[in-house]
């Protein structure tokens, strides 16, 4: 006897399972089954496809008028941080620049101070609250970065919190050491601080899967970033890079040269970098909510990357300064509107390709896969990025069990 059957599904979303990320035109290929059925036993998918009455189960969910998809994958978050920076919104409205806010004690260094002052247990409680919000919105696989400690003690603290979250909630979670995220005030120079972070690589390896660096004007140069990435690979890490967010420094090209698993942001990437994606499996992780939140007009050139047969994914970039959202559904809407992605491209970018960007087996519904699914209160898959700003996730299913039920229930 099977454990659960989800029947009469209006649309069953079945992204294609591949060894490599979907590239170029492949991103627009999505198998959407009308009147579908999913059968689950022992936390695994037994069957997913056209409606069938050939299976029995102890529990049945009628998904008439609903969409079922793989659980979403958020491939770029800064989940563990102390404090918040809502007071900066009024400063920005007054026309204060980032540097002016930084000089007033705000900006990233204020988050660094708050993170350093927050105990590991309190940091865990805050991050857990934010993680549970993600889960309620349909995410069951997450990448979590450090980068607000900027010293040995606090970078380790962030990574330990991330690992504790993964263990407690038994999630598909990957952890990224982003020690070189900024340069703390106490550092004698960018170069000296970078060497401190490189020296930490062997120690943080037990807590982190990836090593990341912020390659940008005023932070770390292309040469420094390459040096760090090479040292990280020597220490056994797969590498990522925050690249070309503001200036076209060539971070995307560097990521491809160093065979990074992903290059993230890429708002200012050059045509040369986009062309180089053609012969690479590096995933371009685009973060349109960041551009939206910062009030900027120029978004990453997703269409140019796809035209060059590149692989792209989408993520929230959840952080307290430039993308204060842990709702990946909102990112899907912004991507459709501002990156000009089709609904099919959006769905692949938050499932199978996002999984490739963090090297996990997720984002698909195939026989034998973990039964990590979302039942959406929506008539079709196009509706979810179309009707933005609310939570469409009705039920979230992890390992075959309903762990979130957002069904509205109230007394008139």
Curated annotation (Swiss-Prot):
Keyword Plastid: no
Any GO MF annotation of the entry: zinc ion binding
Residues annotated to bind Fe(3+): 76, 78, 242, 317
EC number: 3.5.2.7
Annotated SUPFAM superfamilies: Composite domain of metallo-dependent hydrolases, Metallo-dependent hydrolases
UniProt pathway: Amino-acid degradation; L-histidine degradation into L-glutamate; N-formimidoyl-L-glutamate from L-histidine: step 3/3
Binding annotation for N-formimidoyl-L-glutamate: 148, 319, 321
Protein name: Imidazolonepropionase
Native organism: Staphylococcus aureus (strain bovine RF122 / ET3-1)
């Amino acid at each position: 006897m099977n454990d659960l059957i989800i029947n009469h599904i209006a649309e069953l979303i079945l992204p294609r399972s591949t060894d490599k990320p979907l590239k170029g035109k492949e991103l627009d290929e999505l198998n959407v089954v009308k009147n579908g059925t999913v059968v689950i036993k022992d936390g695994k998918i037994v069957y997913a496809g056209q409606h069938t009455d050939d299976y029995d189960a102890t529990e049945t969910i009628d998904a008439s008028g609903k969409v079922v998809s793989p659980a979403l994958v958020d491939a770029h978050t800064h989940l563990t941080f102390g404090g918040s920076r809502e007071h900066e919104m009024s400063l920005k409205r007054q026309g204060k620049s980032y540097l002016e806010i930084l000089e007033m004690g705000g900006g990233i260094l204020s988050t660094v101070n708050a993170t350093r002052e927050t105990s590991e247990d309190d940091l865990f409680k805050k991050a857990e609250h934010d993680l549970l919000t993600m889960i309620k919105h349909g995410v069951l696989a997450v990448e979590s970065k450090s980068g607000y400690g900027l010293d040995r003690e606090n970078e380790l603290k962030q990574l330990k919190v991330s690992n504790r979250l993964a263990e407690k909630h038994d999630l598909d979670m990957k952890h990224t050491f982003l020690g070189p995220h900024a340069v703390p005030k106490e550092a004698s120079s960018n170069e000296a601080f970078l060497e401190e972070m490189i020296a930490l690589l062997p120690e943080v390896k037990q807590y982190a899967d990836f090593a990341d660096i912020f390659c940008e004007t005023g932070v770390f140069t292309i040469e420094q970033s390459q040096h760090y990435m090479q040292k990280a690979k020597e220490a056994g890490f797969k590498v990522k890079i925050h690249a070309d967010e503001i200036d076209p420094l060539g971070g995307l090209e560097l990521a491809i040269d160093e065979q990074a698993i992903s290059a993230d942001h890429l708002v200012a990437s050059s045509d040369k970098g986009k062309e180089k994606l053609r012969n690479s499996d590096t995933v371009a992780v685009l973060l349109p909510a960041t551009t939206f939140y910062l009030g900027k007009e120029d978004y990453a050139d997703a269409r140019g990357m796809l035209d060059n047969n590149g692989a792209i994914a989408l993520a929230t970039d959840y952080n307290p300064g430039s993308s204060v959202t842990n709702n990946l559904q909102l990112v899907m809407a912004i991507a459709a509107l501002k990156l000009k992605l089709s609904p099919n491209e959006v769905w692949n970018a938050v499932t199978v390709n996002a999984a490739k960007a963090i090297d996990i087996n997720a984002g698909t519904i195939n026989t034998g896969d973990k039964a990590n699914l979302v039942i959406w209160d929506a008539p079709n898959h196009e509706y979810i990025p179309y009707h933005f700003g609310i939570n469409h996730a009705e039920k979230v299913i992890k390992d075959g069990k309903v762990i979130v039920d957002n069904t509205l229930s109230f007394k008139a």
